[in-house]
């Protein structure tokens, strides 16, 4: 018995020595193999998940909440007090313990949106290193690089009555056109329908709030009437001289417990410069695709047409 205890003590001491002397990258790699605590859905998020999707009622994959209006709550006000209300900022939370993209808050200004407009900056492609939760059948979370790795993709091209193309997109939480990054922390696995709805000109799915906000800034400065050369000859400050709009933007991918793919995204937007007169939005965007049953636990799916 004493020999067993001595052996256990030696193993423990060696393990402790290795842990204390390991570098951060090794620790992250080791921690990725440890069992994670379970995550439970909050009551408020469950209410959103429980909203039934009906393509006839929600042809563009979103439903308005509270008549489409929001109010700044205590956490919103605290964040604005802390981060400021004049200069643009973005708050990313990184990946959670399960490797999933989390909510993003931002103060959107004309300067931020102008800099990433297509007339000024061409949107880059996603790096091959950007992998998202649910993307792979054999997915593994790389805690060192904060991304997902895998060989067998869950994504495939489908031919459905309302869609011909790949089922999934790497879906921005904060759109590139609104100042978002192309990194894993700003991306979830979203259906094409979640991204653009029915491809309506006014924007569907996540495109609806994104288009509404983007057009507000573009219209204020006449960006749509500028040539690329004209836009690129101006600094953001010069281009946005006549714009006073400041939009508080809060986007929250919502998951059911430990699932890797969000059931949908809660989007809130509020123009703080005029108490929500210009922009006031509150909606739930369904992460669904008609004729497809998605296994949100791992991103696999079956076609049911």
What are these regions (language model features)?
Residues 24-79, 83-86:
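N-terminal, intrinsically disordered, polar/charged segments of Gram-positive cell-envelope systems
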Residues 101-305:
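Domain-level detector of nuclease and nuclease-like folds
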Residues 14, 28, 48, 57, ...:
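Alpha-helical structural elements
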Residues 6-7, 106:
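Short amphipathic alpha-helical "recognition" segments used for binding
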Residues 7-19:
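Hydrophobic membrane-insertion alpha-helices, especially the h-region
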């Amino acid at each position: 018995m004493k020999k067993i205890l001595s052996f256990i003590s030696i193993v423990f001491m060696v393990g402790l020595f290795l842990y204390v002397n390991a570098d951060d990258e090794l620790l992250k790699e080791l921690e990725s193999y440890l069992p994670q605590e379970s995550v439970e859905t909050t009551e408020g998020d469950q209410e959103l998940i429980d909203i039934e999707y009906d393509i006839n009622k929600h042809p563009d994959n979103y439903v308005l909440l509270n008549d489409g209006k929001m109010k700044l709550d205590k956490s919103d006000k605290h964040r604005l007090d802390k981060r400021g209300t004049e200069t643009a900022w973005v708050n990313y939370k990184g990946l959670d313990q399960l490797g999933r993209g989390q909510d993003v808050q931002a103060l959107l200004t004309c300067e931020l949106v102008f800099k990433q407009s297509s007339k000024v900056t061409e949107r880059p492609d996603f790096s091959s290193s950007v992998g998202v939760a649910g993307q792979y059948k054999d997915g593994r979370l790389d805690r060192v690089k904060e991304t997902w790795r895998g060989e067998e993709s869950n994504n495939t091209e489908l031919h459905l009555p309302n869609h011909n193309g790949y089922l999934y997109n790497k879906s921005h939480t904060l759109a590139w056109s609104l100042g978002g990054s192309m990194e894993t922390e700003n991306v979830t696995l979203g259906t094409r329908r979640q991204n653009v709805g029915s491809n309506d000109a006014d924007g569907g799915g996540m495109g609806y709030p994104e288009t509404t906000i983007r057009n507000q800034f573009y219209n204020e400065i006449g960006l749509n009437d500028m040539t690329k050369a004209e836009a690129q000859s101006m600094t953001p400050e010069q281009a946005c001289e006549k714009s006073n709009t400041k939009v508080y933007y809060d986007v929250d991918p919502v998951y059911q417990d430990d699932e890797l793919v969000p059931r949908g995204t809660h989007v809130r937007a509020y123009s703080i410069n005029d108490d929500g007169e210009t922009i006031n939005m509150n909606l739930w965007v369904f992460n669904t695709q008609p004729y497809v049953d998605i296994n949100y636990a791992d991103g696999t799916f079956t076609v049911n047409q």
